[in-house]
């Protein structure tokens, strides 16, 4: 008995007509034998979860670099929140949850250390530019390895959803599946709401600082705002689809306009605020110096990046190497390379009286 076929049949019988069915997938770059239990999107989800790039997200910054507590979001917890929000919206629209989950869990695996500070400086240092959504595709198709081959060989729908989850750059257009479009809106809902929460925890923001007219529309608490946005996305998208006017996931005009204003407020007040900018400057300094070091000493990188350098140029190989680092690993490398180290680490134990007392 092939369980996968039962699941695929259930999708055909139960999912919405506009959902992306596993049996309709455009396939993988390299054809594979189907899994007997899992659909193609289940396989993709599992490959992403078990990848090294996914595990490293737990040590990558969301907004605040090296926050002084255990409850601030990391890039991994952000990813999990996006996944939860997206699956709720997907369920409300009767979409393919397995595809949604694969895209959600993989959407940020190409993010740099130090959040968007790392992305910004690499974009300035590389002549061809750097975008984290495009880099997520590079990680999943070139850097990660499976069965001695480069890349995880994921389905086209998963890669497309990851590539188009961000509304910036040359790939700012929407994903071609509604499941992929769900990730874009879920990403925004997640980061704006949890960044407000973390900013309040850090003492950088009070709820009263947010314009009251935004809160009156979206909600005064974290859970209220999230519920408003998720519920509206489901209701408005269903309304548009039923009217056959639009097959695109979105928010109603009032909610969309208010949410845009709230995001703009967060950019001005927090993301581009003095505290975050000071840390961004330090983080960019570290990455720029590591980038210059590895351009001069490419042999210090693993053989995989030597192959990338031969095929696509040294700049791209160094960017791939650095973008995969965690925040802590970046800092430790910088210390090892640029900060003088004592030749006798236990000197104070050997000579406790240094003559200064």
Predicted feature residues:
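Histidine-centered, transition-metal-coordinating active-site segments
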Residues: 1-79, 83-89, 96-97, 130-357
């Amino acid at each position: 008995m092939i369980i996968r076929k039962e699941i695929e049949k259930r999708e055909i019988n139960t999912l919405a007509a506009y959902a992306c069915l596993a049996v309709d997938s455009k396939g993988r770059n390299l054809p594979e034998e189907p899994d007997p239990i899992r659909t193609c999107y289940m396989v993709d989800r599992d490959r992403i979860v078990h990848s090294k790039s996914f595990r490293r997200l737990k040590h990558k910054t969301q907004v605040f670099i090296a926050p002084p507590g255990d409850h601030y979001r990391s890039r991994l917890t952000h990813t999990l929140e996006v996944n939860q929000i997206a699956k709720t919206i997907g369920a409300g629209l009767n979409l393919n949850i397995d595809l949604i989950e694969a895209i959600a869990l993989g959407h940020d695996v190409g993010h740099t250390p130090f959040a968007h500070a790392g992305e910004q400086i690499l974009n300035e240092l590389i002549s061809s530019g750097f975008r984290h959504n495009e880099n997520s595709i590079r990680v999943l198709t070139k850097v990660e390895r499976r069965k001695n081959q480069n890349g995880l060989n994921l389905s086209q729908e998963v890669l497309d959803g990851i590539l188009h989850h961000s509304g910036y750059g040359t790939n700012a257009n929407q994903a071609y599946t509604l499941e992929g479009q769900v990730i874009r809106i879920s990403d925004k809902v997640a980061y704006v709401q949890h960044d407000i929460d973390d900013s309040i925890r850090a003492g950088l923001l009070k709820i009263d600082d947010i314009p009251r007219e935004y809160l009156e529309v979206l909600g005064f608490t974290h859970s209220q705002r999230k519920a408003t946005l998720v519920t509206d996305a489901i209701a408005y998208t269903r309304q548009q689809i039923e009217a056959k006017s639009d097959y695109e996931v979105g928010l109603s005009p009032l909610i969309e306009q208010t949410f845009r204003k709230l995001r703009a407020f967060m950019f001005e007040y927090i993301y581009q605020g003095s505290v975050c900018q000071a840390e961004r400057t330090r983080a960019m300094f570290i990455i720029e110096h590591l980038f210059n070091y590895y351009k001069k000493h490419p042999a210090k990188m693993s053989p995989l990046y030597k192959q990338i350098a031969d095929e696509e140029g040294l700049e791209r190989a160094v960017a791939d190497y650095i973008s995969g680092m965690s925040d802590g690993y970046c800092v430790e490398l910088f210390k090892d390379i640029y900060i003088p180290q004592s030749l006798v680490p236990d000197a104070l134990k050997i000579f406790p009286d240094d003559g200064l007392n």
